[in-house]
């Protein structure tokens, strides 16, 4: 490997205290300024004895955590921050990962909010894992119970109460709150953390909040970023003041591969083993991979390799980290490394993570970082209406963030599993904003619910392509969420209340008409959680046989329903899941999602009903309800043996994971998967007459491209027009 030494974060160090707006001439002067503004507030390095939030003495744990807090780089900037917060409505803050900005600054904002009244503080995170784990940590630092004064809110899970003062939440959840409270009146301060990630929800929130702060002079907005490229945020928010907080940084040695790696997963696992065996300094390893399956596979293989090497090698504890892990397993990343063994061989932990560990979470003790140079990214093609998660090269900014994780506590090493030439010449400088590569159906529905009708002139930081917006409007019009003038319909208003894609929301609401809303609730919940079928490499045949025991002849949606029913009949037994190769966590999560969706249905008086199981219409009604949401995601079997998607004319195949043992003429599909081939995944057999009768606007044959499907539908249309056939339907 070639190597080059760099100083991670050196840009901060030289500039941080020279910023005229953010730095103070002396701590005493700053404290005096803040004291004048906030009526006596002076930063205190001595821990107080009484907790004003609970009126009880602080615990010993609080005292211990306080000593760690005052050692964080951000702590000496407390007076500067409080001064800026008092003088300005919007602040842009750049703080490197590990500076303490995510845990400390929201707590200072609580002090500010309490001094002004009793309104709360919201701090958004792009990822649910970060929202949960940071809320847990901050509740400990504030010596309060999680879910009371400090809480979190993520999709399908709200751990907060009316008295919560500080709420960590995903950016999407704050956007959802704005739909019912457009002025966000319950908040005194809103912090947008990790704004540099430019997620879809964060970009929309910035546009919404820019307008809200114009109308609410008392609301404070803090935009926090971990990268130096803050000028764009300042400019967007009318030249808001910039505050820079340096992180603790140590030199990081960067190693590149001389040649591109053919199999980055194999190379990454090999590098972990080499580091553990050959590096003579203590320190943990952080390895970046792209998703849950890859991470679980890597953990198994690393464990197997280490076990095969025998007891002479120090213990290596492998800990996975991805967004759908339950909170108790997420906390394992903070466990200490194993001690050295009897012969002195070093014990380490290796955290195998998605890009959540780039900036959202800080793991102390990491000295070695392995960066294969890939992450999963959403991509969208509006012409064929296909959105997919693809494994894509990361940006230079992400690569720098990753390497910086190695220099947090001492000098470290970063092993980049790509060439230096690829880093310099092939990687983009920054990650492309998600709004420019996403299906905007959900976003447009939310903006319409917020009362923002003129989408063309909405103040996007980076405006999406007009074609993408038009596709979203077209989708919502066909789903009857918008009328022909683009106005929100009553149905659209109800759809917007469900934390679901518009198609799923429409399907769920329409299921009431087909007397199967209980079953569609279960299917929707199963589609909203990670894949429930487990297929380990060492037991693929047994896993496939187990899956076929749940298979339904009409397709995968009904197979998912069978799995959910069987899980409930087993009394939610984890052992039953293990024996049947079912992911227990996915099913528990689906059960929770189902309960949340049922509550929303009850709120809108949407009846929860079922067709009699013995009726011949039981499964027919469910399939008709599926069509009501997914009539735009239909494929027709051609004479070639391939499927052709309706209207978009994409050649596709059924995904190998399907339970269908035959090829129906017409199928609806849940997702389009782009790999080396085009696949449609989670498919169900449907009747073409349902398409024509349940979605006549979309299946208007006058606006149909010439294809085999059109000819079939024309013949069907003629039959439908005869009285006898209509009666039969």
Swiss-Prot record:
Its EC number is 3.6.4.13. It catalyses: ATP + H2O = ADP + phosphate + H(+). A motif (DEAH box) lies at residues 193-196. RNA helicase involved in mRNA processing and antiviral innate immunity. Acts as an activator of the p38 MAPK cascade. The gene is Dhx15. This is ATP-dependent RNA helicase DHX15 homolog. Residues 271-451 form the Helicase C-terminal domain. Belongs to the DEAD box helicase family. DEAH subfamily. DDX15/PRP43 sub-subfamily. Residues 1-25 are annotated as: Disordered. Coiled coil: none annotated. Residues 82-246 form the Helicase ATP-binding domain. Pfam families: DEAD (PF00270), HA2_C (PF21010), HA2_N (PF04408), Helicase_C (PF00271), OB_NTP_bind (PF07717). ATP binds at residues 95-102. One of its GO terms (cellular component) is precatalytic spliceosome. GO terms for biological process: innate immune response; mRNA splicing, via spliceosome; positive regulation of p38MAPK cascade. GO terms for molecular function: ATP binding; helicase activity; hydrolase activity; RNA binding; RNA helicase activity. It comes from the Eukaryota. SUPFAM superfamilies: P-loop containing nucleoside triphosphate hydrolases (SSF52540). Keywords: ATP-binding, Helicase, Hydrolase, Immunity, Innate immunity, mRNA processing, mRNA splicing, Nucleotide-binding, RNA-binding.
């Amino acid at each position: 490997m070639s190597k080059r030494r760099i100083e991670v974060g050196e840009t901060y160090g030289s500039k941080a205290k020279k910023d005229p707006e953010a730095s103070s001439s002396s701590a005493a002067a700053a404290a005096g300024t803040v004291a004048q503004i906030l009526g006596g507030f002076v930063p205190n390095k001595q821990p107080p004895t009484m907790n004003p939030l609970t009126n009880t003495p602080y615990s010993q744990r609080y005292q211990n955590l306080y000593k760690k807090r005052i050692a964080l780089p951000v702590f000496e900037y407390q007076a500067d921050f409080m001064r800026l917060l008092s003088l300005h409505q919007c602040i842009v803050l750049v703080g490197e990962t590990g500076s303490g900005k995510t845990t400390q600054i929201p707590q200072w904002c609580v002090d500010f909010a309490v001094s002004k009244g009793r309104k709360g503080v919201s701090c958004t995170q792009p990822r649910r894992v970060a929202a949960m784990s940071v809320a847990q940590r901050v509740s400990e630092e504030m010596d309060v119970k999680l879910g009371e004064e400090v809480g979190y809110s993520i999709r399908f899970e709200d751990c907060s109460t009316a008295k919560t003062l500080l709420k960590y939440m995903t950016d999407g959840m704050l956007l959802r709150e704005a739909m019912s409270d457009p002025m966000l009146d319950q908040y005194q301060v809103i912090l947008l953390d990790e704004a540099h990630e430019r997620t879809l929800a964060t970009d929309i929130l910035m546009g919404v909040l820019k307008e809200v702060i114009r109308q609410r002079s008392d609301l404070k907005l803090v935009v926090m970023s971990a990268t130096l490229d803050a000028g764009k945020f300042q400019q967007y928010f009318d030249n808001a003041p910039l505050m820079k907080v340096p992180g603790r940084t140590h030199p990081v040695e960067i190693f590149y591969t001389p040649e591109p790696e053919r199999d980055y997963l194999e190379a990454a696992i090999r590098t972990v083993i080499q580091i553990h065996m050959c590096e003579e300094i203590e320190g943990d390893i952080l390895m970046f991979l792209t998703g849950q399956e890859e991470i679980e596979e890597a953990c198994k293989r690393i464990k197997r390799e280490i076990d095969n090497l025998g007891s002479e090698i120090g213990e290596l504890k492998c800990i996975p980290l991805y967004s759908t892990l339950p909170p108790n397993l997420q906390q394992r990343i903070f466990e200490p490394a194993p001690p050295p063994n009897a012969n002195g061989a070093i014990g380490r932990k290796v955290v195998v993570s998605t890009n959540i560990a780039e900036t959202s979470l800080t793991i102390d003790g990491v000295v070695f970082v392995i960066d294969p140079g890939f992450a999963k990214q959403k991509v969208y093609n509006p012409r064929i209406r296909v959105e997919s998660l693809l494994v894509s090269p990361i940006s230079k900014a992400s690569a720098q963030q990753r390497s910086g994780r190695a220099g947090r506590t001492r000098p470290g090493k970063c092993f980049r599993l790509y060439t230096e030439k690829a880093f310099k010449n092939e990687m983009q400088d920054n990650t492309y904003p998600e709004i420019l590569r996403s299906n905007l159906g959900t976003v447009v529905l939310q903006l319409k619910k917020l009362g923002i009708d003129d989408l063309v002139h909405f103040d996007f930081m980076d405006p999406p392509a007009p074609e993408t917006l038009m596709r979203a409007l077209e989708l919502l019009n066909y789903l009857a969420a918008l009328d022909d003038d683009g106005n929100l319909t009553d149905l659209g208003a109800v759809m917007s209340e469900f934390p679901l894609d518009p198609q799923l929301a429409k399907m769920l609401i329409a299921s009431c008409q087909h007397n199967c809303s209980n079953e569609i609730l279960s299917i929707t919940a199963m589609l909203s959680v990670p894949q429930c079928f487990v297929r380990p490499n060492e037991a693929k045949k047994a896993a496939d046989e187990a899956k076929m025991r749940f298979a339904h002849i009409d397709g995968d949606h009904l197979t998912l329903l069978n799995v959910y029913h069987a899980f409930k009949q087993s009394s939610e037994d984890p052992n039953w899941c293990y024996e049947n190769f079912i992911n227990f966590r996915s099913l528990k999560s689906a059960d929770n999602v189902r309960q949340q969706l049922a509550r929303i249905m009850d709120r809108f008086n949407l009846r929860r009903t079922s067709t009699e199981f013995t009726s011949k219409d039981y499964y027919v009604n469910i399939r008709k309800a599926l069509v009501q949401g997914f009539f735009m995601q239909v494929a027709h079997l051609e004479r070639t043996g391939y499927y052709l998607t309706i209207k978009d004319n994409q050649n596709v195949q059924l995904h190998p994971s399907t339970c269908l043992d035959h090829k129906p003429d017409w199928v609806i599909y849940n997702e389009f998967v782009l790999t080396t081939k085009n696949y449609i995944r989670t498919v169900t057999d449907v009747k073409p007459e349902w398409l024509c009768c349940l979605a006549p606007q979309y299946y208007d044959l006058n606006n149909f491209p010439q294809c085999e499907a059109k000819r079939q539908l024309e013949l069907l249309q003629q039959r439908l027009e005869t009285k006898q056939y209509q009666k039969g339907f």
